[in-house]
Each structure stands twice: as structure tokens, then as C-alpha cells.
Amino acid sequence: MKFVLVAVLAYLIGCINNAYIFTKYTRNIDIRNYGSGNAGATNVLRVLGPKAAAPVFVLDVLKGVVAVLLGKYFIGMPGALIAGIAVVCGHNWPIFLKFRGGKGVATSVGVVMTINPLLGLIALAIGVAVIAITRYVSLGSMTGAITFALLNIFFPNSVQVLTFAIVLALLVIFQHRSNIKRLINGTESKIGQRAQIK
């Protein structure tokens, strides 16, 4: 029963969509109707710029941190892992927004940095490096998620942590499936390209 409660609580924390809330109350727009249609920090950056995206990113990261800490407090590491997956699912598919959310990258950053700060930092650094070199946020996001999973193979923790890392990477990749198509076709937007608000 504790596992179910932790999962539900973490999911509901994830459902607090900061991109939607911030843009709705500061600009009176639904961010999902602009740019990529994604309710996340990257799309806020694309549509409204870095000043608007920064608080959204920070709050999304904090969602992951809070959920994992709550899960760990109640059940230990198994609870942290369950909460980590659940909070990302809540961000991606929020019940309050008809399951149209973000891609879970910023929240995943908070999750992995709380579960394993060292491996999380390495994965984050590699992901940021890819973004800096290619200017593709989507490619850097997927690279970071995959890197975290691979690091847990080469520097093994428990089977549970490895399974968690793989599932998290798959969630990130799944949410970027349209980006993958655009990357292949050469039509993916690069960081710095602004979308117009009609």
C-alpha cells in the first residue's frame, strides 16, 4: 500500500505543470498552442525566451527532487525509484491537463541528481555538452538520459537502480519520438530559434 501511495503522490506532484501555470498567469496563453506544443521549459524558451524559461526549468527540477525525497523518506531507495518514475509520468501525462504535458527532461534531471548525484552530474554534463555543440536540446536530452543508464551499467548499483535508469531513459526517448524524426529529416529546431506568438 505504501508503494501505491508514494506513486500516486509523486504522480500528482509531477502533474503540477509549471510551464502551463507560468505562461497562463504571466502571458495569459496556453503554451501548448505555441511552438512545439510541448508544456515544458524548452518550449517556453523557444516561445518566450530565457527569462521565462529559467523559473520553469528550476521548478520542474525541484519537482523531481521533492518527489524522490518523499519516496525515500517513506520507503527508502525503492520508494525513491518508484517516485522518480511516477513524477516524470505526471509531468509527461498530467491528469489536470488532459494528459498533455511536457517531455520530462528537467524533472528527470532533478530525479537522477537526487538518486545518484555523481552519475547524474556526469550525465547532465554530457547532455549539456551535446546541446552546446549541436544546438539541439532534444539530442542533448536523450544523450543525457541514455548516458545515465549506461553509467549504471558500468558503475553498477542494484538491479533496481539499473532498471529504473533504463525505464527513465526509455520514457525520455519515447517523449522525443517526433524530435527524432525531425532530427533525421534535418528539420529539428535549434536552441536560440524563437517561435512566434500570434
From Swiss-Prot:
A cellular component annotation (GO) from this entry: plasma membrane
Keywords: Cell membrane, Lipid biosynthesis, Lipid metabolism, Membrane, Phospholipid biosynthesis, Phospholipid metabolism, Transferase, Transmembrane, Transmembrane helix
Enzyme class: transferase
Catalyses which reaction(s): an acyl phosphate + sn-glycerol 3-phosphate = a 1-acyl-sn-glycero-3-phosphate + phosphate
Membrane topology note: Multi-pass membrane protein
UniProt superkingdom: Bacteria
Subcellular location: Cell membrane
Pfam family, one: G3P_acyltransf
Protein family (similarity comment): Belongs to the PlsY family.
Cross-referenced NCBIfam families: glycerol-3-phosphate 1-O-acyltransferase PlsY (TIGR00023)
Function as written in the Swiss-Prot or TrEMBL entry: Catalyzes the transfer of an acyl group from acyl-phosphate (acyl-PO(4)) to glycerol-3-phosphate (G3P) to form lysophosphatidic acid (LPA). This enzyme utilizes acyl-phosphate as fatty acyl donor, but not acyl-CoA or acyl-ACP.
Quaternary structure and partners: Probably interacts with PlsX.
Name this polypeptide is given: Glycerol-3-phosphate acyltransferase
